[in-house]
Amino acid sequence: MARSVDTEAMTTRDPSSKRGGWKTFPFMIATLLGLSIASFGWVMNLVVFLIKEFNIKSIAATQNSNIVNGCVSMLPVVAAILADSFFGNIPVISVSAFISLLGIILLTMITSLDHLRPPPCETGSILCESPSKLQLGILYIALALVIIGSAGTRFTLASAGANQYEKPKEQGSFFNWYFLTLYTGAITGATAIVYTQENASWKLGFGLCAVANLISFIVFVSGKRYYKHDKPMGSPFTNLIRVVVAATRKRKAVISSREEDYHHGLGREGKTSSAMPSKSFRFFNRAALKTEDDSVNNNWRLCSVQEVEDFKAVFRVLPLLLAIIFVSTPMVTQTSLIILQALVTDRGLGPHFKIPAGSLQVIVIITACIVILMNNCLVYPMYQKLAHKPLTPLQKVGIGHVFIILSMAISAIVEAKRLKTVTNGHSMSVLWLHRDFIASVVIGISFYLSTALITLIQKTTKWLPNDINHGRVDNVYWLLVIVGVLNYFLVCAWFYRYRNLNDDDDQEQDPKDDTT
């Protein structure tokens, strides 16, 4: 009898124990490859699509593209929260891939049916018919669908793939393949798909994106029985919000200097928690302060010391995150404007080949791969050998700021050269744009700031007309140089100092650790 019970228990455990592992690898990687080709295929050439197919003015098309890219880069955080807190990664990926497929099919229909877009006209013509409200409405619905679909798979697919493995070494190997596949799909979408859109037809280009998305969706769903399904564990953002709420509700309480007046959590958390909250950002120490009205069961009024310290750790890096946002704004502005520059340059390579304007962005991806490889294998080890100490993370950030400033300066010089060439009646080769484009890597949240910056410049100056041949884009780049210099000195070189995590939080910082 006992033997039959054991056998029954083993059979009930076997299905879950057999899930996960390397048998899920082909499904995850094939899904990622198809979704990457589809996603980069439509987003890389969006500015050109809006200008040529919807007769939208160049600057307005750039701003719309920035908003779309901003959503694609920010909404994955929302998708990750939904996956972690409520649904799990696998259902979110399935639904998102299907939504993305619907959006790309709608984009394909827009390019196939003439009444879903305005009549075509010559680029830059003042007689172009604007799209109707119905046509714009359908376009925005399609873009909303592909944005939600792309955002829903960006982080969750990586997390779901890593969760299939138990050993850290296997997870690391998966991430290596993950990024290799991601870049392969991005390069394929930014070259083959974009070339098809501009040289064959937009209908065929979006159709190929739809096929890639459909195949990836079918592959992912067919492997569902092999996946290890992660259970929702709750969002870490909830704990951060609870600290703010608890501290605010007890804002009038007097901060104590006694260890026993603070809540240290229950069970294992209470044993590993800090004895006293640190003195930095003391206002939030009230969240862990025990008062007469507090209850251990009410975690929106009483948090543990460890939760308070976790919140402070996140709060300390906010200025650095803001620095990343502001330093990324010049990069994404450059990314947007360089497509407009490419449209008015000579993109021919020989008599029969013309580089698509949207494909220029693939240089960012290729350059990022090369630079990361060179840094990890050559530059950083050589510096450590010569200086007898490694580069700190903030020093690497500072070096990145310098290169971004140089990139903006080069962009300004190249644009001034291009304008001079245009006034002389000649067209400039698109290869000139490669030099300044190599230094830029797109970071998503800055697309919104880039949109606001372009709007501000357009309203206050005459530097950004719809025909940039009559504008001063070089002055825009010089303005971005100034922004980059101010950002570097105010945040990277001035505000930040290192903390030694092995020492007490209250210990005075060593001035030698200042980042310069």
Swiss-Prot record:
InterPro entries recorded: MFS_trans_sf (IPR036259), POT_fam (IPR000109), PTR2_symporter_CS (IPR018456)
Q: Which cysteines in this chain are paired by disulphide bridges?
A: none
- Say where the protein is mainly found: membrane
Q: What does this protein do?
A: Transporter involved in a passive nitrate efflux.
- This protein's UniProt keywords: Membrane, Nitrate assimilation, Transmembrane, Transmembrane helix, Transport
According to its UniProt entry, one GO biological process term is: oligopeptide transport
* Superkingdom assignment: Eukaryota
Q: Which PROSITE patterns match?
A: PTR2_1
Q: Mind telling me what this protein is named?
A: Putative protein NRT1/ PTR FAMILY 2.2
Indicate the family of this protein.
Belongs to the major facilitator superfamily. Proton-dependent oligopeptide transporter (POT/PTR) (TC 2.A.17) family.
Q: How does it sit in the membrane?
A: Multi-pass membrane protein
One GO CC term, this protein:
membrane
Tissue expression, as annotated, is: Not detected.
